[in-house]
Each structure stands twice: as C-alpha cells, then as structure tokens.
C-alpha cells in the first residue's frame, strides 16, 4: 500500500478505519511495531494491578490499537503517538510524581476477538485508561467491558455517532469528531460540486451506517436527491448487484464509504463505466485512505475525491518529525496527533483529579479541554495544574473544547483529490465544521 499519501493524510485525516509496542515503566518507552504477540508490556516491578486500575500508585495506560485487521495501516502512527505522549509526560515529571506506564495491545477487527482478549489482559494488569480502538465497530464490542470495570476508554479515531449517546457511565471519550460533522462536510462538498443526485454504497456497521446516514440527511436538506442507498455486509467481496443498481441509477455522484474493500468496489465501478475517470463524480471518506495502494491499477482513481477529519500537519512540524523518527517516514501518520492528545488529556485529568481511578479521571477530562488557562503541552499544563489553575489544553489537534458527551465540539476536515496515474491525493482545502 502506498504510504506517501497516508503520510500527508496522517494527521490530516481528519474518517475512518498493535504491533505490540513494548516499553518499560519509567521514561523508557519503546514502540517496536514489529511484534505480533499482542504487545504485552509491564512495569519493571511486575505489578499486576487490580482489574479496573485505580490503585493510586501510578497511572497505567493500556492501548488497543490496530496492528492487525482492516485498519492495521493506522497502527504505527497511533502506537507511536501514544509512546511519544508518555515520553513527554515522564520527561515533565510524570503523574503523581511517578512515571506513567503504557501497556500496548492490538485491537484486530470485528472478524476476531482480539480486542476482547486484549482488554481482559489490560484490565488484569491494572490499566486505569485504555486508548482505542481505532475502529468504531471494534470499540462497540468492548466498550461495556471496559467502562463496566470503572476504566476510561478513550479513542483517537472513533467517528460513529453512536458514541455520543451511548450509555458508557461517563467513561468514554474521543478526540476524533463525530461523523455527524463529516457527513455535513461531505454533503456540502458534493452539492457545491454541482451534483443534484447522488447514490451511496456503504459498509453495514457503526462507522459506515452512521456516516452514510449523516450524508443522506445533510444532502437531502441541501436540496439533493438520493437515488440509491446501498448497504453491504462487511465480509462482502463481490459487488455485482450493488454496481448494477448504481449503473441503473445514473446519479451525478457516487459516495463510497468503506475500508480496504473499497478497492473492489471502485474496480467494478470502473469496469462498468461509472468510476472516477468517467463522467460520474466519485467521492470517498477517511476509511478509504490508502486506496491507491490496494489497487492493481491505481490510475483508475484519477479524479476520486475524499473527505477526512484532519489535523493540519503544517502547524505541527516538530511533532511530525518526531513521529516519523519513531515509526519511519514511509508509515502513515493518520491519527498520530489525536492519539498523542488522548494520552495527554488523560494524564492531565488524572493530575487534576489527584487520582488514577477511572471515575475520578473521567470527571475532569472534559474540563481540561475547555474554560481555563490555555496551554499547549503537558509540561506547560502540569505547571499550571500544580499552581492550582484551571487549564484548557489546546493540543496538536487544536482546541478540542469537549462537549459534555466527551467529544470535540468542532473539527477541521481535509478535502483531497487523486491525480494522474493514481498518484497520492493532493490537498484541495481544509474545511472547519462545528
């Protein structure tokens, strides 16, 4: 898969879709992405911890980030971002005067029980918070297991609207915006392109359904007409019936909401004369990232446009340099910044709470992102916390201003287009939505 484009989208994606990074307690945090054994890591003293964490001795952060599965290309940046965050926290004195411990784990995807197995391990090892998963569908398989244990779940990449109202005991948070925002941005872009009609083909799970519904609602509200609204099972590999329906519809635009299987969809569309190089305007989303690397002939993507929740990497060059040094320049950097910020916010909330208990930390998470003295690094923020000041952490992803549901009030999105011969997509514009 081509990673050059993902390197640009990396933090820019703003979508959709663990090589067991190992490290020790203390400031020595490793992130060897080459392991495939689940990434187990423990503190030097062998503390097993109690299920649900909260022993008050040290802040233990577990992760379920994708080394395997549909979104494995996101793993290196997310693991690397979490490791860099812990490195910075510990360099500034840690939390409770003690180094933060990070325990890396794999999330897999919904075709396996990897996430459930890893969550059980992380809880048994005393995790106070668990960062992940990247996939909304995977998070939904473990959210009750995590939050019922009194532990925080904090995703850097979940975008499904389902989480806004999920009964999570106030213990679920995310730095990625809801797809209610991306659906609005996508609909506006398709309308602004001059398309009066559109068809949607989407994977039938929380991410795909949520984003498709948001697009439909906003597209129709803007005066557009939806011709076909086609859901497919996540294990589908042939799309003959769906492509027949799309051809018959003859829509001005087609929106593809999927993961790696989007390659099969776009290939079939191209063979039937409705692909990106035809007169049909074809749009994708963050879940389609790296699509050119999945195709035998990436040139069929010329003109394919996509939206993605994004961080402007031009605003954070030092972090990008550090992240690439950590994971390699050829890896995607998507959601690396959001993962970094999720860890920093968790640590700051623990410091404000004076506790590593999940409920105590959760009570402070939203407020450390809003309403206080603005600070932009853990070192700067912890100095204010220690001085008794309220803080407003504006991280790599900018001002999050979490709403009470534990998610950003606003976000920026990148609009990009694939060029000639399937070259990596070029940035067209950033769009802000709230």
Label each region the model flagged.
Residues 19-21:
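C-terminal motif of bacterial Sec signal peptides marking the signal peptidase cleavage site
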Residues 11-14:
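Hydrophobic helical h-region of N-terminal Sec-dependent signal peptides
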Residues 2, 23-434:
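Extracytosolic ligand-binding ectodomains
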Residues 1-9:
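Bacterial N-terminal signal peptides that target proteins for export
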